[in-house]
């Protein structure tokens, strides 16, 4: 599951994207049950402890956008492993919960190069060495709110670690877009998982985190 390979070929196919977003909605309902069961798993499976990770990577921020809840659950697993601060990116105008409506709006925003206004109050990002950026794959890349954020705040010199939920299109072209949006940052090895499998991804997340060579960006 751990890969930053460019898998954009075919990632814009509407059937793949719609399948991504349809399964994300189903995964939200399934996750209510599976997430409860996952909470019973011994947290000791995480090989990375928060204090050790922060010692290697300096101050850590986990910044994520989640529509159906899958990416939020993945962010929580990462937070358990590395500690730091966790912030959910939200927009002034919330996205609709209706599946067809959010699919159409996400596509429209991408075509129009929209930059949705953000309602999230962010801390001074200069104080962080490592920023985890989490998102669902929408139409082959990051949701447009992240374009708003990353065109506003400079992350030069920082470690950026992408993590992504999807239902078949993996990272799409999102990692390439991150490199364009953050040309002065260090993009580290990311983690991608199907949204429907997030609840069972704890061991994979732990293995991925243990393999990250987090070092101070200074």
Which residue stretches match the model-derived regions?
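N-terminal secretory signal peptides
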Residues: 1-23
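N-terminal export signals
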Residues: 14, 20-21, 27-49
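Glycine-rich phosphate/pyrophosphate-binding loop and the adjoining helix
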Residues: 193-218
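A short beta-strand-loop structural module common to alpha/beta enzyme folds
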Residues: 84-96
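Short beta-strand elements in bilobed, periplasmic/extracellular small-molecule ligand-binding domains
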Residues: 86, 186-192
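C-terminal segment of N-terminal export signals and the immediately downstream linker at the start
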Residues: 44-76
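Helix-loop-strand module that forms the ligand-binding subsite of alpha/beta enzymes
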Residues: 94, 102-186
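Cofactor-binding loop segments of dinucleotide-utilizing enzymes, especially the Rossmann-like FAD-
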Residues: 65-67, 89-91, 165-167
